[in-house]
Amino acid sequence: MKRLLYGLCTLLTVATILRTAAQPAETPPTPAPGSAAAAATTSTTPTSAFEKRPVALERDFGRLYGTLTVPARGAETAVLLIAGSGPTDRDGNNRLGIRSDCYRLLAEELTAAGYAVLRYDKRAIGSSVLDDPTQLPELTLDQYIDDAAALADYLAGEGFRRVVLAGHSEGALIASVAAQRSPAVAGIISLCGAGYPIDEVLRLQLAGQLVPAHMELFVEVEQIIAALKRGERVDMTYHTQGLQALFNSGVQPFIISQMRYDPRQELRKAQVPALIVGGGNDLQVPADNVEALAAARRDARKCIIPGMAHTLKACAETTLEGQLHTAYGDPTLPLAPGLVQAITEFLGGL
């Protein structure tokens, strides 16, 4: 049942976006050189090994902002790094208290290996604020997908011969669908991506919590999920209070859009080479999700990194409480050994 944690985490983080994304982005103070804080956020990759460029792309809501790192000697392949669910920024941190720097570290290590990497704040997250905040409750997964496809086209327009989409968690599904919408995409990488559709995950998870003791509540859940699956919004006024919070009107458009996609089918439809990566200690999206995706794309490479948590970090902890203080809360932890090698071997074969 551990794999079913993914669904509830997705809904809770979507709700958090709606509460926090309209607030001005907070800029953390710059640590003093030589301080402990500065040491904690310093990459082991020397900045002289690459050039860092700001990116701003006009979209229908405003601008997408990101950071492009390019090797000093240049690169033929560019990787677009797509963040996971919740208000997670381009570096892999968010206001829920997650501080991992995992995307920044991955971008810098891949750039040191010879690949350009663009990481960005998704729509309504970080610096990519909405010009019209009233549109926030209408946020959908399809908008994220179109944004990723537009950034892939942007990278191709910048002269990179190959563009690869690397999506983490929810970003893996975004990558699979965006690859179908942009002819620039030459490959996709699923990093701890779910292998099951969100409605299936939610049904199984909530059944495990509610059946048989609360059958009447589970029947209510089934009715709500079935309506959302049909694309119908649900008036939660007369539903149980706990379900009102989980399926509130502000998150329903996003859930409905997410339910249109089965990660296995979308990976199968993406007609580009694929790498599927999972973590041996991932408590949010355990390794059986890798097998589910691999069964849909038997030509894809797959790799389960021993000891890797959902944040792509090396972590010996196998409890959620233990990981919250380490993999999710300690930016000094390194990326899991073997992760960068698995990615660069895939990129080198394209």
Task: Please describe what each predicted stretch is.
Residues 40-74:
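N-terminal cap/lid segment of alpha/beta-hydrolase-fold proteins
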Residues 73-74, 79-110:
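Short, surface-exposed "cap/lid" segments of acyl-processing enzymes
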Residues 101-129:
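Conserved alpha/beta-hydrolase
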Residues 136-157:
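Alpha/beta-hydrolase active-site loop
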Residues 153-208:
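Primarily recognizes the serine-hydrolase "nucleophile elbow" in alpha/beta-hydrolase
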Residues 189-264:
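Accessory cap/linker subdomain of secreted extracellular hydrolases
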Residues 270, 276-278:
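Short beta-strand/loop motif that positions the catalytic acidic residue
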Residues 311, 317-350:
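Catalytic active-site module of serine/aspartate enzymes centered on a nucleophile-bearing elbow/loop
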